[in-house]
């Protein structure tokens, strides 16, 4: 009965929401940025902000935390709205949703309202121009927090009106510390290999790490969560398998490498883009011992990265996964003869 209750708890709760930071000091791995944001909260004097950085590093959590701390738990929802620009990329999101919220007065004596626009780099150039005009018009009673993956995709007139903060990819230590807290709270047992796999899969993305942990916990409810469980539930190849695939091809054993590739594609169900991404990670992170053992030069590594990039581009353009990946392995096998 207890096991069933715990299993039901895992199913019902969404951990990325349950464990989302609600205060700035709970945001992991962005200490310098968070300290600067705290100064705005302390004075309740907030400029327009632009948060730039990869997914899952605390941009949204920071925006919500700012609203909670400035307005308080009773009023923050009335004075804060969150919109996702990737849902509506055009000018209508500015003309309708943003303007309708911005033109109303703050509630409960709040000094201003906050509009959080996530994935702002998805907005078209016309929509960004309209947003810039809206920011100017309603600056007396509204503050904008824009979030994006690439600040270069935000037009200069908007960037110049914002204080820009760059959120970096989270360290392995920051991710592990948070996962250990969640595991303790949920009563989970995770092997050291399980933590290593979660960190590998996450690639600095806390959201992905927590989602991966919950998916694994749903499967292994009665035992320790292992490395194998993480890779299986996230459709990720074991890095050692990818490393062996590359070494086999580079040693000229093309047919053996192709057989392993087919296993990853058809038995493990991995996508071609995921495999290429993992191949790139192994090649770009090769240690000196592996390079010497395979007899590779710096020029060889450059050539391998170049052909990996070409393969990745072709896959995104819709080319056959099997043909492109086999061609990639063939290039690896032939590289030793050139």
UniProtKB/Swiss-Prot annotation:
GO terms for cellular component: DNA replication factor C complex. Keywords: ATP-binding, DNA replication, Nucleotide-binding. SMART domains: AAA. One of its GO terms (biological process) is DNA-templated DNA replication. GO terms for molecular function: ATP binding; ATP hydrolysis activity; DNA binding; DNA clamp loader activity. ATP binds at residues 53-60. The keyword Transcription regulation does not apply. Belongs to the activator 1 small subunits family. RfcS subfamily. Part of the RFC clamp loader complex which loads the PCNA sliding clamp onto DNA. HAMAP family: RfcS (MF_01509). Heteromultimer composed of small subunits (RfcS) and large subunits (RfcL). This is Replication factor C small subunit. The gene is rfcS.
């Amino acid at each position: 009965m207890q096991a069933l209750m715990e299993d039901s708890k895992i199913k019902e709760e969404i951990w990325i929401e349950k464990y989302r930071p609600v205060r700035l000091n709970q945001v992991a791995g962005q200490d310098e940025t968070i300290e600067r944001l705290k100064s705005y909260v302390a004075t309740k004097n907030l400029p327009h902000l632009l948060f730039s950085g990869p997914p899952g590093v605390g941009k949204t959590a920071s925006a919500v935390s700012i609203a909670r701390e400035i307005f308080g738990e009773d009023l923050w929802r009335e004075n804060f709205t969150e919109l996702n620009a990737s849902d509506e990329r055009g000018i209508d999101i500015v003309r309708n949703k943003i303007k309708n919220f911005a033109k109303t007065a703050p509630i409960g004596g709040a000094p201003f309202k906050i509009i959080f626009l996530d994935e702002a780099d998805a907005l078209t150039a016309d929509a960004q121009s309209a947003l810039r005009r809206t920011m100017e018009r309603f600056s007396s009673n509204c503050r904008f927090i824009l979030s994006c993956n690439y600040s270069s995709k935000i037009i200069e007139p908007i960037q110049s009106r914002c204080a820009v903060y760059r959120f970096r990819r989270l360290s392995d230590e920051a991710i592990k510390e948070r996962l250990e807290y969640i595991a303790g709270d949920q009563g989970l047992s995770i092997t050291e290999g399980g933590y290593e796999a979660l960190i590998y899969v996450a690639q600095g993305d806390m959201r992905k790490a927590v989602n991966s942990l919950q998916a694994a916990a749903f499967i292994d409810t009665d035992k320790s969560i292992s490395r194998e469980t993480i890779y299986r539930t996230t459709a990720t190849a074991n890095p050692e398998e990818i490393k062996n695939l590359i070494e086999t091809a580079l040693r000229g054993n093309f047919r053996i490498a192709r057989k392993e590739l087919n296993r990853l594609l058809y038995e493990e169900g991995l996508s071609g883009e995921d495999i290429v991404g993992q191949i790139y990670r192994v090649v770009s992170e090769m240690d000196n011992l592996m390079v010497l053992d395979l007899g590779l030069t710096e020029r060889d590594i450059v050539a391998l990265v170049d052909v990996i990039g070409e393969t990745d581009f072709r896959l995104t353009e819709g080319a056959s996964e099997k043909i492109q990946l086999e061609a990639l392995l063939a290039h690896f096998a032939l590289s030793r003869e050139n």
